[in-house]
């Protein structure tokens, strides 16, 4: 099994790269999806979040009120550290279980771990390769506004709450520039895949 770490800032094109790699045959483990699963009603992580941030972060149906929690943690580094201290260990445990399952199913699998906070979480996985999806901050802010309807001020705050591009790029073995067209991104991903299969 080869384990590839895929990371990048918010709206950097990680999901586009992960989807393309899945189409080509990679087993993709999505840390964001796992992060949603580990805070579902009844989970220990959701109970810890409630204790740390109060009942206001729980919606009437018992689910996590993500906008309310986001309003608390984005822009408050101490609150974000508390949240990450709750969620990251749960996500890492579940992710490890999925890597192991992929290796059992196919010892030659190429497993792509799509993990936005790879640098922030001081990830200790033995990646064979770390790939960074990169677009400049202005492009990412525009995508957040145009594609996700995020308020420009909120977009800037969200981008600013993450590690710097320089820190993220310093962790890269390979950078995929996602600032151009979709076809240009796909060409880079296809070349990566050919190298991994070679």
From Swiss-Prot:
Main localization of the protein described in the UniProt heading: cytoplasm
Subcellular location: Cytoplasm
Gene3D superfamilies: P-loop containing nucleotide triphosphate hydrolases (3.40.50.300)
Database matches in NCBIfam families: dephospho-CoA kinase (TIGR00152), PRK03333.1 (NF002879)
Similarity section: Belongs to the CoaE family.
UniProt-listed PANTHER family: BIFUNCTIONAL COENZYME A SYNTHASE-RELATED, DEPHOSPHO-COA KINASE-RELATED
Name recorded for this polypeptide: Dephospho-CoA kinase
Gene this chain is encoded by: coaE
């Amino acid at each position: 099994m080869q384990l590839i770490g895929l990371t990048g800032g918010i709206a950097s094109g990680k999901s586009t790269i992960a989807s393309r790699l899945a189409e080509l045959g990679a087993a993709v483990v999505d840390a964001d999806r796992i992060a949603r699963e580990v805070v579902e009603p009844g989970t220990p992580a959701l109970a810890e979040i409630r204790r740390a941030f109060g009942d206001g972060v729980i919606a009437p149906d018992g689910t996590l009120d993500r906008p309310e929690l986001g309003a608390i943690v984005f822009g408050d580094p101490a609150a974000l550290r508390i949240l990450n201290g709750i969620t990251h260990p749960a996500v890492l445990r579940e992710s490890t279980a999925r890597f192991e399952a992929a290796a059992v199913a196919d010892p030659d699998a190429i497993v792509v771990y799509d993990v936005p906070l790879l640098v922030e979480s001081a990830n200790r996985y033995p990646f064979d390769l770390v790939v960074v999806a990169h677009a400049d901050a202005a492009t990412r802010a525009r995508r957040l506004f145009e594609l996700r309807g995020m308020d420009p001020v909120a977009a800037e705050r969200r981008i600013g709450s993450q590690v710097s591009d320089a820190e993220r790029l310093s962790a890269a073995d390979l950078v995929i520039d996602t600032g151009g067209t979709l076809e240009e991104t796909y060409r880079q991903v296809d070349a990566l895949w050919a190298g991994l299969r070679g």
